[in-house]
């Protein structure tokens, strides 16, 4: 019987050594001519991360952008990004999941810079890959429960192991969360169920998984910025400006299939397929105007009913190693097909009313309604995108590696809205997307690299008054260095410049968010990331980034900074592990700080969200029983700093507060 080799992430505590999706081969990070950062499972566990926001606070150059009232993942990478921009992958595949981090998550990888050659339609800022847990052939399990200082708590069960007498292994993960929202009303309710099954053959491994998640979460756009006063309106941060019916209710699902077959010791063929859905309904009392003299707030009740998104992604890869011309070649070739469909059925817009006053907050003066706006309903978009690609990593000698690759991408896009339906986009095209990079390994633990790559992304346009929008196109140059230091510490330094043309942004036109396109924007920056072990007791993950993202060509915004892009971001989290104590138990302490400088709150730069620094801390005690039990306390925003995590970018009426001080206490048992 042959030996099955399952490639993947090797890590030691906080130190990542490999990130196979970044090259779609099992390449060491030192051999990749691109900045790749990994937040390991150990970091996620120590920080008790609850979302991608928590995880990505450890990575340089990433800030939050418009999250649609806290209902979507939305991140800026190297100056570029928005919600629903296809940048967040699950196991290297595109999905339509609104929030990709959950109980199935094992680690998170960030591939900086253009990823279009390997992952298709992408921004030049990079891609975020959530890697999920898989069935294992050795039995293990974990059960945990936690409580929040906000009120309420959560629970999780994760069990995996072999099925006796077969070549099968299973994994079953379930979780439930029901916690109070930190502002004056609202609850976060979520549940998840995820079974998976793997079959291990002589040369083949097949894994199928299913995840279904239900959610009912606050739709909270934050507060108003008073530009004349130079700050937020004078209202306690816990007081909301909307109504208790501001809720998004929905469910999402993800079905995946992975087949990996070893053709020979050097060659492997892999097939991946994912099918994802997200269906939701939301209601909101949207702020439309504010009178600073009287404190009166004009609101409009809006709703989306019958919103549905579907995504299919299929990929076939052939990877292998060959010797040609006396040199080693790590080869990748493949084909991919992506399908994405969005339908928002009933768009409800009620009459505006002066229905709130910040001097006398009261709720209930407005109710939901059923006033469907025919011209804005049935928003529909469909994107089909087949492609083929090739990559060759050529090892010229023991020190030099040259990586060259290209993708030929086709696309067909239609979109429109209204009853009767008005088609405003019907476009198709193709694009050749290349990238070239080189690595110089000065020593076995030090490498220097350079790369140049293009990116390409057709634009979502059912909310555009312009009709067909030209695809966004980007070009990035990057140089950098990587180190693997003694005791298990990894570091990387990157310097880059990226130009993007035909960039979309959003404007509030009489209460309707319209999509528009700028001419050209440019982002330049420096990034530094460090993670791993300093000593046998100390582990650390740290980052710093300088990002200068400005509009270079546009009728209105030339010279303006891009909204929500901070020039400086920094983070540090350090953990001290006391090891095994005299009584046989374990104990560790950790603390860290996350800092973000001021950044524009709106496209015209008429106001800036202030910078902030937030301190976190944790302690964990493990009882060395037959089934180890760990009790963990995590403190976030230890000094209760008031800060803003992001803004709408299109108006001053949506500025999201960051969470105040909160504590979570959890207990987990492993078996």
Report each predicted region and the residues it spans.
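Conserved C-terminal beta-signal and adjacent last beta-strands/turns
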Residues: 331, 450, 477, 563-671
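Membrane-embedded beta-barrel scaffold of Gram-negative outer-membrane proteins
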Residues: 260-274, 278-284, 441, 447-449, ...
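Surface-exposed extracellular loop regions of Gram-negative outer-membrane beta-barrel proteins
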Residues: 214-230, 341-343, 435-478, 483, ...
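Acidic/polar loop-and-plug regions of large Gram-negative outer-membrane beta-barrel proteins
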Residues: 177-181, 194-262, 275-309, 352-381, ...
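Gram-negative outer-membrane beta-barrel transporters
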Residues: 497-499, 517-602
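Acidic, small-polar-rich N-terminal luminal/periplasmic segments of exported/outer-membrane proteins
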Residues: 2-138, 479
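Outer-membrane beta-barrel translocator/receptor signature
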Residues: 104-106, 117-195, 199-205, 253, ...
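Structural signature of Gram-negative outer-membrane beta-barrels, strongest in the C-terminal barrel
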Residues: 198-200, 309, 328-330, 336-340, ...
């Amino acid at each position: 019987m042959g030996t099955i080799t399952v490639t993947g992430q090797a890590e030691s505590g906080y130190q990542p050594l490999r990130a196979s999706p970044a090259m779609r081969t099992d390449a060491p990070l030192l051999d990749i001519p691109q900045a790749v950062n990994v937040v390991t499972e150990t970091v996620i566990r120590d920080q008790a991360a609850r979302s991608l926001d928590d995880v990505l606070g450890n990575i340089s150059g990433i800030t939050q952008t418009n999250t649609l009232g806290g209902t979507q993942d939305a991140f800026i990478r190297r100056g570029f990004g928005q919600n629903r921009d296809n940048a967040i992958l699950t196991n290297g595949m595109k999905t339509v999941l609104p929030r990709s981090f959950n109980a199935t998550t094992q680690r998170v990888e960030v591939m900086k810079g253009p990823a279009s050659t390997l992952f298709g339609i992408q921004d030049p800022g990079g891609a975020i890959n959530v890697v999920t847990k898989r069935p294992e052939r050795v039995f293990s399990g974990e059960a945990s429960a936690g409580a929040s200082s906000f009120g309420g708590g959560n629970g999780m069960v994760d069990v995996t192991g072999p099925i006796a007498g077969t070549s099968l292994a299973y994994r079953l993960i379930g979780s439930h969360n029901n916690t109070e929202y930190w502002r004056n009303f609202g609850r976060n309710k979520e549940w998840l169920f995820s079974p998976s099954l793997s079959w291990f053959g002589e040369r083949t491994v097949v894994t199928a998984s299913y995840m279904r998640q239900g959610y009912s979460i606050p739709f909270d756009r934050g507060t108003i910025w008073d530009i004349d006063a130079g700050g937020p309106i004078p209202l306690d941060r816990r007081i909301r400006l909307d109504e208790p019916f501001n809720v998004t209710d929905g469910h999402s699902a993800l079905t995946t299939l992975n087949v990996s077959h070893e053709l020979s010791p050097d060659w492997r063929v892999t097939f991946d397929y994912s099918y994802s859905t997200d269906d939701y309904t939301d209601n909101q009392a949207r702020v439309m105007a504010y009178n600073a003299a009287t404190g009166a707030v004009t609101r409009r009740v809006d709703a989306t009913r019958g919103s549905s998104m579907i995504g299919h992604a299929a990929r076939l890869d052939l990877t292998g190693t060959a010797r040609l011309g006396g040199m080693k070649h790590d080869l990748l070739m493949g084909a991919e097909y992506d399908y994405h469909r969005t339908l928002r059925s009933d768009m409800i817009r009620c009459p505006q009313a002066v229905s709130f006053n910040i001097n006398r907050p009261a709720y209930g003066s407005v109710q939901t309604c059923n006033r469907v706006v025919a011209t804005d309903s049935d928003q529909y978009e469909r994107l089909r995108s087949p492609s083929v690609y090739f990559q060759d990593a050529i090892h010229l000698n023991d020190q030099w590696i040259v990586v060259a690759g290209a993708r030929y991408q086709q696309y067909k896009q239609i979109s429109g809205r209204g009853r009767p339906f008005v088609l405003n986009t019907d476009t198709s095209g193709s694009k050749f997307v290349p990238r070239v990079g080189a690595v110089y390994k000065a020593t076995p633990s030090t490498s220097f690299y350079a790369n140049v790559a293009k990116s390409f992304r057709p634009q979502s346009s059912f909310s555009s008054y312009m009709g067909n929008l030209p695809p966004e196109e980007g070009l990035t140059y990057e140089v950098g260095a990587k180190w693997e230091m003694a005791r298990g510490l990894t570091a990387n330094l990157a310097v880059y410049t990226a130009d993007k043309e035909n960039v979309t942004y959003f404007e509030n036109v009489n209460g309707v968010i319209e999509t528009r396109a700028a001419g050209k924007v440019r982002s330049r920056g420096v990034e530094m990331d460090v993670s791993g072990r300093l000593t046998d007791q100390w582990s650390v993950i740290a980052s710093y980034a300088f990002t200068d993202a400005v509009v270079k060509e546009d009728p209105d915004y030339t010279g303006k900074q891009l909204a929500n892009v901070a020039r400086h971001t920094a983070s540090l989290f350090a953990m001290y592990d006391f090891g095994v104590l005299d009584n046989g138990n374990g104990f560790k302490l950790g603390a860290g700080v996350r800092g973000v400088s001021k950044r524009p709150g709106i496209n015209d730069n008429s106001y800036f969200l202030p910078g902030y620094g937030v301190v976190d801390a944790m302690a964990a005690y493990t009882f060395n029983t037959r089934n180890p039990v760990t009790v963990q306390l995590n403190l976030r925003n230890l000094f209760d700093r008031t800060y803003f995590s992001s803004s709408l970018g299109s108006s001053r009426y949506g500025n999201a507060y960051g969470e105040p001080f909160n504590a979570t206490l959890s207990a987990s048992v492993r078996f």
